Every structure is written in C-alpha cells, then in structure tokens.
Swiss-Prot record:
InterPro entries: Aldolase_TIM, FBA_I. Signal peptide: none annotated. GO terms for biological process: glycolytic process. This is Fructose-bisphosphate aldolase. Pathway: Carbohydrate degradation; glycolysis; D-glyceraldehyde 3-phosphate and glycerone phosphate from D-glucose: step 4/4. Substrate binds at residues 50, 138. It comes from the Eukaryota.
Amino acid sequence: MMDCDHLLRLGMTAKKILENGKGILAADETPKTLGRRFEKLGITNTEENRRKFREILFSTKGIERYIGGVILNQETFEQTSGSGVPLTELLKKKGIEIGIKLDKGLIDYKEKEKISVGLEDLDLRCKSSAFKDATFAKWRSLFYFYDGIPSEDCINENCSILAKYAIICQKNGLVPIVEPEVFLEGDYSMKRSYEVTRQILSTLMKYLNYELVYIPGVLIKASYVTSGQLSNEKYTPKKVATFTLRALLSTIPCGIPGIVFLSGGHGSEDAIGFLNAINMERGCRTWSLSFSFARALTDGVLETWRGDDSNIEEAQKILLETSFKACRGAEGKLWDQE
C-alpha cells in the first residue's frame, strides 16, 4: 500500500511535467529506429552520432520553457556530453523531468495483432540504479485496424499489461505514461477510429482501476481520432478535435491529470494543428491536453543538422521554434500573436 506522501509526489510530478502548457519530448527511439531516420539523411548510425544528436536536443537554450519532460532510451542514461557531463544532467539542470521507456517492444498475438512485453523483470528495472534520475516512465501498446481487428481479446490483454506496468511503476515512485497507440496505417474511417478508441480507452480505465493504480498519478498518451492513411476520407483539424475530445470525455475520468498526444505518423504542422484545435474546443474537462512528440519535434532538427556540427545552432533554433508552437497549441493559442 502506497502512503499519502508517496501518492502526493506522484500526483505533483505528473502535474509538473505539463504545467504552463509544457509537453513532452519523446527521445526514446531505439538505436535501430533512430538509425533508420539517420540513413534517410546520409548520417552514419554510430553511438557517437546518436549521442551527439541527443546532446543537440537537450542542450538547446530555453527548451525548458516548452518541454516539461523528456522520455529517454536506456542507451541515453549511459551517455555524456562532449564535455563529459551526463546527458541526464543537462536535463536536470534545466528542471526537466526525466522519463524512461520500459516496454521491450511487441510480439505477435493471434492473427495480425501485437501485444507489448517486458513485465517479467519490470520491477527490477524500475529499481535499477542506472535509471535513478528518472521520475516517470512510458509503455507503449499498439493496435492495428483491419476487419474485426483489434479483437476484444487483444484490447483486454494490452490494457491489462499497461495497467500492471503502471502499478509497478507507481510502487517504485515513477509516474507511468500509458500509451495505447492506434496505428495510423490502414483504410479505416474516422467513425470506426472513434468507436474503437472509445473501446480501448474505456477498457484501459477499467484495468487501471482493477490494478488499484493511483489515477491522479498517471498520464495517458493517446492517438488523435482520424481516418487511416489509406482512407480517402478527408478531415479538418476541427473535425479531428470534435471526434477526439468526444472520445476522451466519454471515457477519461476527471482524476487523470493530463493526456498527451503522440504525433503517430502525422507531420509536425498537422500534429500541432490538431492539438491547437482540440484545446480550442469547449468542453467540461479537468485534465490538461498537451503533446508527447518525437518526429513532430525533431524531424526538422535532424534535417537541418545532417551530421554537420556547423549546423547545430540552426538545428537548435528549429527545435525551439517547433516546441514553442507545440506549447501554444497546448494552450489553444497557436494563432494568437499577442
């Protein structure tokens, strides 16, 4: 049983990450995933280049005005800056909360479906001194959309796993981010996306409560409700906002301190535009609505840097500008010039 002080710290950390419209930078890509992004731009996928890219992100002056938390990959906890300062220390000095990606990826579950794995040694990893600077964590499950998929069994299994991860994190003093991602690829309609998103989120809340997760000490990382990439259905930011907020209001209780959106294959302009439109919607809600973006924040940085140190200053300028826009979107003030 977690005592009141323990629960209070969890709740305060969750709120601090998203205070004043701040959001989360998802820098938790594996070396393999980051390597694919490097390859497209002619950057060699070495440990040194990955370290240097992360240092560019974390050392950007003023980034703490817009970013309240950064999710890291395990490799990053072992890396230092060019001057020998641990990369985690760069973030701590800016008052940015440090997160750790804890799922171990996905495995096959029935036909065309996946479940996330990593629970078997999660408690030990949460206790590891290697991650002593982390105050929050993230775990991702992925839902594919085909005929009859995701199945009810898959939804239940993934949501149960997310809830078990969440309670283990909380017992170890980490604020859990639970991420039930809806895969953007597919030809599904916005209506189907809305219906299944509601089913997933309501099931997630059921299991979080079943596992006795402290609701004010958890954050939800959600997908925007859109049609699939292969669908011919068109949508505007206003329509995305209406369907997404409706799904959230129907499923997420007031105790949740915040919901952050993943870009999930949407470009930076769309991802931030959707966030802004949602925050402009009227609705009786108590939770913060912000962002937890990876590529939407860093694609421009990577394209500008391209492994050339002479481009670092310009790359950091782009990160700052994009983060500022995302922060304005989290306040529903993207187009407010005042």
